[in-house]
């Protein structure tokens, strides 16, 4: 029996913004990273741009500018075990991991972690 190895190529999209009241990540690549480096206002995260495929991944990294900021989420983001965060913690980095679920057309939050 012959075994053939196939190299799997991943598309990556990396986007960074200092601050926005309506941050809009990208979601059309298999791997997407969206970073907010100094959030200076409350933010409502818009639906990711692009056409996602089932299983696409999106990491959102958020840090405020030294003042806690409110966070809200478009309905396309769906909580799983943990609630979507509603505020930042002053000067702490937060990571949120999402996987696109094409059966429900939702970005399911599968991970959340915050700087200690």
Task: List PLM regions with ranges.
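Exposed extracellular interaction/assembly regions and N-terminal maturation sites
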Residues: 2-77, 92, 99-116
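Terminal beta-strand-rich extracellular "head" domains
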Residues: 76-90
């Amino acid at each position: 029996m012959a075994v053939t190895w196939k190299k799997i190529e991943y598309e990556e999209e990396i986007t960074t913004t200092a601050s926005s009241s309506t941050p809009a990540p990208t979601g059309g690549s298999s791997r997407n990273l969206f970073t907010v480096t100094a959030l200076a206002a409350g933010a409502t995260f818009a639906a990711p741009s692009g056409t996602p495929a089932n299983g696409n991944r999106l990491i959102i990294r958020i840090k405020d500018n030294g003042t806690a900021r409110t966070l809200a989420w478009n309905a396309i983001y769906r909580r799983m075990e943990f609630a979507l965060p509603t505020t930042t913690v002053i000067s702490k980095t937060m990571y949120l991991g999402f996987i696109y679920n094409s059966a429900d057309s939702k970005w399911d939050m599968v991970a959340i972690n915050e700087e200690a």
